[in-house]
Amino acid sequence: MANKTKKPIYPFEDWVIRETQFSIDTNYRNETIFTLANGYIGMRGTFEERYSGPKNTSFNGTYINGFYEIHDIVYPEGGYGFAKIGQTMLNVADSKIIKLYVDGEEFDLLQGKILFYERVLDMKKGFVERKVKWESPTGKILEVKIKRIVSLNRQHLAAISFTMQPVNFTGKIRFVSAIDGNVSNINDSEDVRVGSNLKGKVLKTIDKSVEGLKGWIVQKTQKSNFSYACAIDNVLVADSKYEVSNSLEEDGVKVIVDLEAEKGTSYTLNKFISYYTSKDFDENKLVALALEEIEKAKNDGFETIEKEQEEFLNSFWKDADVIIEGDKALQQGIRFNEFHLLQSVGRDGKTNIAAKGLTGGGYEGHYFWDSDIYIMPFFLYTKPEIAKALVMYRYNLLDAARSRAKELGHKGALYPWRTIDGPECSAYFPAGTAQYHINADIVYALKRYVEATNDVDFLYDYGCEILFETARFWEDLGAYIPLKGNKFCINCVTGPDEYTALVDNNAYTNYMAKMNLEYAYDIANKMKKEVPQKYQKVASKLNLKDEEIVAWKKAADNMYLPYSKELDIIPQDDSFLYKERITVDEIPEDQFPLLLHWHYLNIYRYQICKQPDVLLLMFLQREKFTKDELKKNYDYYEPITTHDSSLSPAIFSILANEIGYTDKAYKYFMMTARMDLDDYNDNVKDGIHAASMAGTWSAVVNGFGGMRVYTNELHFEPRLPKEWNLLSFNVRYKGRKINVKLTKENVVFALLEGEPIEIYYFDKKILLEKGEIK
């Protein structure tokens, strides 16, 4: 159901999302909202007892971050260097199944009567709990309470506590706890952002076993040659005799518990679930590892896992919580967004954060530049150890990036536009491989990480390789063009705005490449002086010559940086201003998003933007532009930006804040803050918009909080919205933890952890010391 009026869907509460009635019409959407994940395992909010509703009103998804199948990318008319192999994150076995039968009648929300229904996502304690009072078709009434946890502490573990109580009868009840490996990915959508390129079932069951209350299966992919084990164990908590039976299915296992239930007595089945994959562990040890995991969990007990979850989240919220007083909707929205970011992010250096997190298979589970530019800052300034893992992920892809550059005839490394673990998976090169700016985006994230943490060891041991290989690439990609005054030009590229493709001198790309080249030159020279042995080691490994480093500086110094004297703005690229200008107001509302209604040739023909391009550059390299320049470019590009990308509104909110367009700043912030929670685009059923969620944090901290990070300096120019009474957030920077609190009366900075530090409040320099409030 489209939420065209943008009305709130869930009651406003600080720490929970509450669903108060079950409806077929909203079920699909709610499966995304009530997803639980831990950066490794993701379980959509489907019901333990399964769902018998109509087709296309549910998708039962369980995902393991980075676990994928490969497939050939088929082109009717291919070409050299086209991406050949696709990767798709797989929907793996559903292990959360607990069916309930009462005297042979199946507990099913689409049968009988629902007398009471409530489902709660508790973001402080990290669980989903569902309470149902249900009357069977023959009049038996029972109360059911189901609590689910995907452990943030134990990445391979999930647990469910399923409690039932007969209200008006005594009779036979049966729990059926199962693993169902007969699964596939969504592939019936015409929206390229949603469907999968994998057709039908791709996982083959190669081993399975069930004994007593315990069972497991092992499944293997057909082409990527990965396997995984899923194991379950069950504990019945009841003062009652029970009988256990079980069965092996073609692609799964069932554990059946039968008992006599008395009226008014509660019976609980606790289920412990574990997944291990051959991507990370020896294939022959997967079952043993999964069984060991659930054995430990069973011995510790469900309550221990609950307690661990709350403690983990308590630590997270101490750093990451943003407090807003004066708008309960936004308070709930930003916490929901941050909670899902934490759930979605890989923390092992081998995985990243997919565009849809672990809530759905949209975009095939691929990682994009979103994680480097939009998502990285949230973790960098709240949980820097997670930011480090994201940068390490890029280092671990470096060999694949080198191979891609070589394939395309270039030196150095070219990172894939979309991938899971290395190869380019974007089949549409004009909005894929041509977005070379991803190289500089990754370096920008690396640079920010090093500046914010002082982790020079990471830079010298790992990051410098990324830096030098990407600089090599830029110097090789560009050329000195006589008719451009012998400036260094980068031609035939696509910038962040995907509604303009294959252009010369995209401003964002050129400025970011210049930054990349300059940083590489500076770090190479710094390493020569400060850590000569480490420099020699990396120079030898990369066969790096001094003349290359000089060439980087020359390219950076001579970089062509577009500017229009006539309009006094930065043109998006060499051709952009020579196209017909069309404003968003001129396009009928039913034509959005344009990519689903217009041929790309028609889109490329106009001055029309999917998302900020020049304006994103101005945000990322804010110190290079005056406020007047920012305003002129904002005024030019805003009317022609469709915001068809969920990445768009947050940047517009931040910049509008600085310019003084306070109403626009708030409007754009509202577009991003509850985009998924209120299902603004009628597509949250397909999964969250992870980068937009991170953009919410940026819109608060960089927008209303006015935080800018210049080289080794924290600046604040806060502006509390008139709708709010208070805004409070924390920032981790260079080993310090700083609290920023805005009220209508004043702004207060407090150093909570670390050594004294100087910050800037507008143009005023302030020395913060621990224990002092300024």
Curated annotation (Swiss-Prot):
EC number annotated for this UniProt entry: 2.4.1.64
Pathway(s) served: Glycan degradation; trehalose degradation
Sorted UniProt keywords: Glycosyltransferase, Transferase
Oligomeric and partner information: Homodimer.
Membrane-crossing segments per the record: none
A molecular function GO annotation: carbohydrate binding
Species of provenance: Thermoanaerobacter brockii
InterPro entries to which the protein is assigned, alphabetical: 6-hairpin_glycosidase_sf (IPR008928), 6hp_glycosidase-like_sf (IPR012341), Gal_mutarotase_sf_dom (IPR011013), Glyco_hydro_65_C (IPR005194), Glyco_hydro_65_M (IPR005195), Glyco_hydro_65_N (IPR005196), Glyco_hydro_65_N_sf (IPR037018), Malt_Pase/Glycosyl_Hdrlase (IPR017045)
Record's protein name: Alpha,alpha-trehalose phosphorylase
Class of this enzyme: transferase
Active site per UniProt: E498
Top-rank lineage group of the source organism: Bacteria
Temperature section of the record: Optimum temperature is 70 degrees Celsius.
Gene3D superfamilies hit by this protein: 1.50.10.10, Glycoside hydrolase, family 65, N-terminal domain, Maltose phosphorylase, domain 3
UniProt family annotation: Belongs to the glycosyl hydrolase 65 family.
Swiss-Prot/TrEMBL catalytic activity: alpha,alpha-trehalose + phosphate = beta-D-glucose 1-phosphate + D-glucose
Binding of substrate, residues: W369, D370, K610, Q611
pH note: Optimum pH is 7.0-7.5 for phosphorolysis, and 6.0-7.0 for synthetic reaction.
Function: Catalyzes the reversible phosphorolytic cleavage of trehalose. Phosphorolysis is specific for trehalose, but D-xylose, D-galactose, L-arabinose, D-fucose, L-fucose, D-glucosamine and 2-deoxy D-glucose can act as substitutes for D-glucose in the synthetic reaction.
Activity regulation statement: Inhibited by Cu(2+), Hg(2+), Mg(2+), Mn(2+), Pb(2+) and Zn(2+).
Any single Pfam family the record assigns to this protein: Glyco_hydro_65N
GO biological process annotation, one example: trehalose catabolic process
